[in-house]
UniProtKB/Swiss-Prot annotation:
Its EC number is 4.98.1.1. This is Ferrochelatase. GO terms for cellular component: cytoplasm. Belongs to the ferrochelatase family. Pathway: Porphyrin-containing compound metabolism; protoheme biosynthesis; protoheme from protoporphyrin-IX: step 1/1. GO terms for molecular function: ferrochelatase activity; metal ion binding. The lineage of its organism: Bacteria, Pseudomonadati, Spirochaetota, Spirochaetia, Leptospirales. The gene is hemH. It is found in: Cytoplasm.
């Protein structure tokens, strides 16, 4: 059997024709579109919301300059190839990099079972640094539908990696390389504006994460806790390298009227401007590749809000993508997942209350 690593991401439409499929997969997922409704109401409602949002979303994707779609799938493919090469360099063996998406194409539901069974020679890497029911648990459940067993207790399954030292150091170095204009622009999208940051040691740094509904936190989701821990660790590493600016944590991409994790990044920028802050850099801490939420939301929408609130200097730090130190970190984290067997179902430890669970049952089925 050949060595393989499978990168799993949420997904994004590659062109206009895939937008509706992407949104339907997103809003039909009970762990993403998590509402206190009977399934016979929730699922059709999710499909209706997807169809209603599709035209507006299409206009946003059209403005990004990627043929009416998202670059996320192609960027993930670049990461898979780069990580496979890094694994070959570390192990001296041949590795094959593959990708699949939980929403849209390539569809995880259509993938051959052999690719979804985690083993020492078949690493499954969900590209989420932090746990959330709507990402990691949703991914595990989709894998289980094909394999017929919960994958997270098996060697070869990569758990959320926000606390990994090699990951943390790679993100610290990415931020510092951006500040000091040392990034290879060919490795990043929309990089023409990368000019470095003068007096970077004192700029205000916002770690902006994708928000989630508070109802998920109330169910035991550890996402917010892990974001905060990630920020604290990065602050420590940055301060050790001479950074002295203030660090802030906020959440973006809210959808709908329900209460989400706070503070919202919009509110954060408004407050910083009100307080007289003139220089801000934003890093997308919950994302590992650039796409709609980083290029359009952080790069354009939030920049306008910053300028409208008196902030004179605004920088979008890119997601890691194929940044070499990040790629090497992901390869090492992947190998760590096969070096010791967990031999237990760890779904409960990943967060979430499951009141209907019987003793010994895996919550992935709920």
């Amino acid at each position: 059997m050949k060595n393989r690593i499978l990168l799993i991401n949420l997904g994004g439409p590659r062109d206009t024709s895939e937008i509706e499929k992407f949104l339907i997969d997103l809003f039909e997922d009970p762990l993403v579109f998590d509402l206190p409704l009977p399934e016979w109401i929730r699922k059709p409602l999710g499909k209706w919301v997807a169809k209603k949002r599709a035209p507006k979303v299409a206009q946003t994707y059209k403005s990004m300059g990627f043929g009416g779609g998202s670059p996320l799938v192609s960027e993930t493919s670049k990461q898979a190839n780069a990580i496979a090469k890094a694994l070959e360099k570390i192990t001296g063996e041949k590795w094959e990099g593959n990708i699949t998406m939980t929403c849209g194409y390539p569809d995880i539901r259509k993938l051959n079972r052999d690719f979804l069974v985690p083993t020492k020679q078949n690493i499954l890497l969900p590209l989420y640094p932090h746990f959330s029911r709507s990402t990691v648990l949703s991914t595990a459940k989709l894998v289980e539908q094909t394999t017929k067993f919960c994958p997270v207790s098996y060697e070869g399954w990569v758990a959320p990696f926000h606390s990994s030292q090699v990951y943390l150091e790679s993100i610290r170095d990415l931020i510092l390389d951006f500040f000091q204009n040392r990034l290879n622009r060919k490795d990043f999208l929309h990089s023409d504006s990368f000019q470095g940051v003068s007096n970077w040691e004192t700029i205000d740094l916002i770690f902006s994460a994708h928000g989630i509904p508070i109802r998920l936190i109330e169910k035991g989701d550890r996402y917010r806790e892990e974001i905060n821990s990630n920020v604290e660790n990065l602050k420590r590493l940055l301060y050790e390298k001479g950074f002295r600016g203030k660090c802030h944590t906020s959440f973006q991409s809210r959808v709908g009227p329900s209460k989400w994790t706070e503070p919202n990044t919009i509110t954060m920028l408004e407050q910083l401007g009100k307080n007289g802050v003139k220089r801000v850099a934003v890093y997308p801490i919950s994302f590992v590749s650039d796409h709609l939420e980083t290029l359009e939301e952080i790069g354009e929408q939030l920049k306008k809000i910053a300028y409208n609130n008196g902030i004179a200097e605004y920088h979008r730090i890119p997601a890691p993508g194929i940044y070499p130190k990040f790629i090497e970190a992901m390869a090492k984290i992947g190998l760590e997942s096969i070096q010791s067997s967990k031999n237990e179902c760890i779904c409960k430890k990943l967060g979430g209350h499951f009141p209907n669970l019987k003793s010994g049952e895996c919550p992935i089925n709920f």
